[in-house]
């Protein structure tokens, strides 16, 4: 068991041997190592504030890991895990098409009653179509279905379904996501073709949530969503792909013609050396109209 401040088994002496701890976490993701070391430093500062040598030891290791991670980010290099599971955007679309072919083969769209297997296949298709359209994190778990804006409590994520004589309009409402404090509430209109598919899914879904567990009794949790995504891609392409990797894949495709971070830094450095201004000042000096 690793560091758990809630456990009675842990006390400050647990971390008296830094090398042992470093060795214990060395094979974990750099981000995981960094987070664990940060937690230890915070813990030691509270529990053993006078042991500067011990705290500095962990702090230096934390800074070293942070530096390695920053270098990888600046180099825009895939991690080993990403390299093993990376797929192209076209391969992502191929998986979606393969699932749809299976849906057609089983005539699922013509059925009036779906067993759990058929429902799961249809849900997988709608889920991937949603993530192709909206490359979010695990924010599509626990999405509640509402029919009026008045039901939006400003806290949860919702699928707003509006149906009238002129047709149906659906909206994805995001109130709860990682960077909501920066970007605020987001309301996304959903494409009409996708609306038709969601309506079919909801015909067989009598709950108040968009995506359900296999038994169709409870909504997907964040962990359920991760496991489901992993199963889908392992089945159709033999790789472990989740929402985080899909975001990397899609934004890499979207920005594939942009200069790299390193190229931008090199240009900025040359301009700074030439004009003896910061990059910010050089951008302000630059006139485009």
Language-model-detected regions and their locations in the chain:
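Conserved tyrosine-mediated DNA breakage-rejoining catalytic core shared by Y-recombinases
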Residues: 143-192
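Amphipathic alpha-helical scaffolding segments
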Residues: 58-61, 142-151, 253-254
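Basic, Lys/Arg- and aromatic-enriched nucleic-acid-binding interface segment
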Residues: 94-139
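Active-site/catalytic core of tyrosine-dependent DNA strand-transfer enzymes
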Residues: 183-246, 250, 255
């Amino acid at each position: 068991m690793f560091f758990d401040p809630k456990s009675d088994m842990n006390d400050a002496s647990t971390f008296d041997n830094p090398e042992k701890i470093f060795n214990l976490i060395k094979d974990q993701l750099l981000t995981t190592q960094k987070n664990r070391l940060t937690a230890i430093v915070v813990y030691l500062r509270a529990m053993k504030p006078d042991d500067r040598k011990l705290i500095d030891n962990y702090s230096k290791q934390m800074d070293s890991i942070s530096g390695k991670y920053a270098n990888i980010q600046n180099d825009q290099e895939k991690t080993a895990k990403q390299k093993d599971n990376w797929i192209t955007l076209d391969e992502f679309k191929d998986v979606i098409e393969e699932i749809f072919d299976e849906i057609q083969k089983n005539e699922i769209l013509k059925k009036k009653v779906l067993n759990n297997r058929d429902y799961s296949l249809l849900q997988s298709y709608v889920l991937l179509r949603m993530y192709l359209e909206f490359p979010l994190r695990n924010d599509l778990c626990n999405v509640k279905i509402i029919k009026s804006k008045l039901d939006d409590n400003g806290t949860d994520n919702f699928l707003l379904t509006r149906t009238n004589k002129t047709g149906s309009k659906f909206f994805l409402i995001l109130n709860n996501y990682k960077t909501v404090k920066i970007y605020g509430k987001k309301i996304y209109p959903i494409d009409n073709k996708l609306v038709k598919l969601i309506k079919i899914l909801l015909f067989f879904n009598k709950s108040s949530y968009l995506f359900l567990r296999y038994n169709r009794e409870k909504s997907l949790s964040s962990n359920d969503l991760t496991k489901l995504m992993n199963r889908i891609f392992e089945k159709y392409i033999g790789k472990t792909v989740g929402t985080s990797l899909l975001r990397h894949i899609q934004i890499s495709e979207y920005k594939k013609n942009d200069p790299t971070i390193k190229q931008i830094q090199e240009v900025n450095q040359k301009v700074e050396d030439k004009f003896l201004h910061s990059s910010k000042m050089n951008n302000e000096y630059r006139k485009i109209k």
